[in-house]
Regions:
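Long, low-hydrophobicity, acidic/polar, solvent-exposed interaction domains
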Residues: 1-98
Length: 98
């Protein structure tokens, strides 16, 4: 669920994402969403550190549109780590043929 994006395609077998875990989404416009809520880039670290659920679970899934530059995704991942998240799962589309 969450904000719709075109995920990168992979040949990896499908792994089930835990439905109750929070999802961080990066759209092709490089907008960032925590769950269904848009979070400005300059407020992301604060949003992560003040989210009680994330600070308890310390786990988050990241999905990014396949057109988002790698450097931008890397910056978001660094902010996630600074925000105290210890486990970050990357969501892809396992049906890819590339």
């Amino acid at each position: 669920t969450g904000v719709p994006v075109d995920l990168p395609k992979t040949h990896a077998p499908r792994m089930e994402m835990e439905q109750e875990k929070l999802l961080l989404t990066i759209t092709k416009e490089q907008k960032v969403y925590l769950g269904e809520t848009e979070v400005p880039y300059d407020r992301l670290e604060a949003a992560l550190t003040t989210n009680t659920r994330l600070q308890t679970e310390r786990e988050l899934y990241l999905q990014a549109d396949e057109t988002v530059p790698y450097g931008f995704v890397a910056k978001i991942m660094a902010l996630v780590r600074k925000g105290g998240i210890e486990k970050l799962g990357l969501v892809t589309d396992p049906t890819g043929s590339e």
